[in-house]
Amino acid sequence: MNRDHFYTLNIAEIAERIGNDDCAYQVLMAFINENGEAQMLNKTAVAEMIQLSKPTVFATVNSFYCAGYIDETRVGRSKIYTLSDLGVEIVECFKQKAMEMRNL
């Protein structure tokens, strides 16, 4: 098995696990705007968008940051988050799965 194939399988598995957790899925997808593009948000904005408790959203954002699914940028004393390249690949897996489901 070549390295790219192994990497693709791991991304698909990660996407499936996130997709099975409603909170994790909502937090990750909050970073995608209505045009399907990645957007920058702070943790409070994510919590308000998806209407989940701040502690839950903050913990999920922190875990995604530690896992490398989102990137953090300091703006003054605040931190802004956006999808990393890995996070974008996971979202692409969600989109691909949705298209497959529509074609069934």
Swiss-Prot record:
Swiss-Prot/TrEMBL induction comment: Probably part of the tubR-tubZ operon.
DNA-binding region extent: 43-50, 54-65
Traits of the deletion mutant: Loss of plasmid replication. TubZ levels increase, TubZ still polymerizes.
InterPro entries linked: WH-like_DNA-bd_sf (IPR036388), WH_DNA-bd_sf (IPR036390)
One GO MF term attached to the UniProt entry: DNA binding
Record's keyword terms, sorted: DNA-binding, Plasmid, Plasmid partition, Repressor, Transcription, Transcription regulation
Effect of residue 77 to A: No DNA binding
Applications reported: A miniplasmid containing this and downstream gene tubZ is able to replicate in B.thuringiensis subsp. israelensis and express insect toxin proteins. The miniplasmid could be used to make plasmids for insect toxin overexpression.
Gene3D superfamilies the record matches: Winged helix-like DNA-binding domain superfamily/Winged helix DNA-binding domain (1.10.10.10)
Top-rank taxon, per record: Bacteria
Single biological process term from Gene Ontology: plasmid partitioning
Its job: A DNA-binding protein that is part of the type III plasmid partition system used to ensure correct segregation of the pBtoxis plasmid. Cooperatively binds to the centromere-like site (tubC), which may seed filament formation by the TubZ polymerizing GTPase, stabilizing TubZ filaments. TubR-tubC complexes track the depolymerizing minus end of the filament, probably pulling plasmid within the cell. Required for plasmid replication. Negatively regulates levels of TubZ; its effect on RNA expression has not been shown.
Subunit comment: Homodimer. Binds to tubC DNA, the TubR-DNA complex binds to TubZ.
Domain notes: Although this has the same function as TubR of B.cereus strain ATCC 10987 there is little sequence homology and the dimerization interface is different.
Other comments on record: The pBtoxis plasmid encodes all the major endotoxin proteins (Cyt1Aa, Cry4Aa, Cry4Ba, and Cry11Aa) responsible for the mosquito larvicidal activity of strain 4Q2.
Protein name as it appears in the record: DNA-binding transcriptional repressor TubR
